[in-house]
Amino acid sequence: MEEGTLCAMSELSSGKITIDAPISEVQVALFEVAKYPEWSSSIKSVEVLATDEQGRLTTGKFVIDAGMMKDKVTLDYEWADAPSKLSFSFNDADLLTGMEGSYSIKKIDEDTTEVTYELGVEISMPIPAMMRKKAEQATIDQALQQLKSHLEE
């Protein structure tokens, strides 16, 4: 894989959820990446390594524990499509060899927002593609449900 390219994953797993919260509140929750451990049980900690001129995280080191995906992962965040989309890509990890994903945010009405989460991972150990996809989907479903619970409480 060439430096700076996205992971060579066949296709990303994805999930979608409708949240009873204004789009501005959803954006705040998703854009404050360093606060993910407050609502996502699979993200144990986030260390901010770099930010842009607006103070948004551009590189962060995450301690994740999502079933078979337990690792310390450094991710780069891309803000070019914000505020409608936040993307991240793999930088470094102990076990994972690739990770990419995004949160897409769409206003349904004044008090309702739809969030689509796409995720793909590559792992250094041999794991059947079906198991990897199942783990990705479980991670997506859990993250979306926890985001919804966090915003609707």
Regions from the PLM with identified roles:
Residues 120-142:
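A short acidic/glycine-rich loop-to-helix N-cap element
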Residues 2-55, 142:
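Hydrophobic ligand-binding cavity/cleft-lining segments
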Residues 37-38, 45, 50-52, 65-112, ...:
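Hydrophobic-ligand binding "helix-grip"
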Residues 31, 100, 130-131:
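Generic recognition of short, well-ordered alpha-helical segments
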Residues 29-30, 56-60, 83-89:
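Short Pro/Gly-enriched beta-strand edge/turn motifs at strand-loop
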